[in-house]
């Protein structure tokens, strides 16, 4: 059986594995204070054109979101998110477990707008009972969104302006950052993201690494005693070299972006194949996550031969399904899928 269930079905890119093997017996300090992590940090700083950035490595996306949000908010604050945001619907209440409310606002195709954030803030400010409420202390977005859609450069710039107006840090979840940046429809570079976001992370788990996410604080704004805060969450990896080595390789010779581009090419071919066979798109996603509307009967038939995600109900006879490509998707498996549909 072939699978397009998600974008973390395989292990790691062969070059990442080779770098891990080649450095395996080299002694290195722990907790991220090793020579490999230091080199990876410098490569990322050069790539994002942000020499004053502070970069830290964690293992997974939910862990990263929880650590960043919990560390940057006061105890009485919550984080603003799209109602479809990962922290709101797919993290098992991890943010709430750390003591912070996820304040959801309406989204369109997975995105929140600057005007909606501004409206929420003005409504909050004018509420005479606001001292009895959770204060908004941060804005969380993801790139791409949960529906594979992208913020434009102008949309991100407007969000940045509104966040500055209300002194809200802008935090971008970049679990699939490479897939967003390498999309044909992206008008941004990673340098733009570093410019407009106060903190973001570069996803490795879904893009070529065994595991790992690189947190980037762009405005000399790393929380105080951040190492200790990471430790509080049980997220401080003793063998920090493991994430450092992987990102060192991913940011050598544009590997991260090249393998991200492959996923987009596979997704575009998939989309064209579905459309040519008469299937409808739920959203016209420009990234590696593709959403289609399939009949219940077709879903039952396909589930016998291919794995994919049933996303949500469309109507009584149809469901929205997601097929995801990745850096490791092969032409062979994609062709098999297109034959099956």
Feature roles, as predicted:
Residues 71-89, 118:
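Conserved PLP-anchoring active-site segment centered on the Schiff-base-forming lysine
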Residues 74-76, 268-269, 273-341:
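Conserved C-terminal alpha-helix-loop-beta "cap" of PLP-dependent enzymes
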Residues 102-103, 170-172, 281, 308:
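Hydrophobic beta-strand scaffold residues
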Residues 13-61, 83-88, 94:
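Conserved N-terminal alpha-helix of the aminotransferase class I/II PLP-enzyme fold
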Residues 99-144, 151-158:
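PLP-dependent aminotransferase-class I/II
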Residues 108, 135, 142, 150, ...:
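Active-site C-terminal subdomain of aminotransferase-like
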Residues 151-183:
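Catalytic PLP-binding core of fold-type I/II PLP enzymes
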């Amino acid at each position: 059986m072939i699978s397009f269930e998600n974008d973390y079905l395989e292990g790691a890119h062969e070059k990442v594995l080779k770098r891990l093997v080649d450095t395996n017996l080299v002694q290195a300090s722990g907790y991220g204070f090793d020579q490999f992590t230091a080199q990876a940090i410098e490569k990322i700083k050069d790539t994002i054109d942000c020499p004053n950035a502070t970069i830290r490595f964690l293992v997974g996306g939910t862990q990263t979101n929880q650590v960043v949000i919990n560390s940057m908010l006061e105890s009485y604050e919550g984080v603003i998110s799209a109602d479809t945001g990962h922290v709101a619907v797919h993290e098992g209440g991890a943010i709430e477990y750390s003591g912070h409310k996820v304040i959801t606002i309406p989204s369109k195709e997975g995105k929140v707008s600057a005007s909606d954030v501004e409206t929420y803030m003005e409504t909050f400010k004018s509420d005479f009972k606001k001292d009895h409420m959770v204060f908004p202390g941060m804005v969380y977005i993801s790139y791409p969104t949960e529906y594979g859609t992208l913020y434009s450069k102008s949309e991100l710039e407007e969000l940045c302006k509104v966040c500055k107006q209300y002194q809200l840090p802008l935090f971008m979840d970049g679990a699939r950052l490479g897939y967003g940046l390498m999309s044909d429809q992206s008008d941004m570079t990673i340098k733009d993201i570093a410019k407009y976001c106060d903190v973001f992370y570069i996803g490795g788990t879904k893009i070529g690494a065994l595991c790992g996410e690189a947190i980037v604080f762009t405005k000399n704004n790393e929380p105080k005693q951040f190492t200790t805060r990471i430790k509080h969450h049980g997220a401080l990896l003793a063998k920090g070299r493991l994430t450092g080595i992987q990102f060192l390789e991913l940011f050598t010779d544009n590997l991260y972006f090249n393998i991200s581009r492959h996923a987009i090419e596979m997704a575009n071919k998939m989309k064209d194949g579905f459309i040519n066979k008469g299937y409808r798109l739920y959203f016209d996603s420009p990234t590696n996550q593709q959403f289609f509307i399939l009949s219940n009967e077709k879903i039952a038939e396909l589930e016998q031969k291919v794995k994919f995600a049933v996303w949500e109900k469309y109507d009584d006879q149809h469901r929205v399904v997601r097929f995801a490509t990745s850096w490791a998707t092969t032409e062979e498996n994609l062709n098999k899928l297109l034959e099956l549909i």
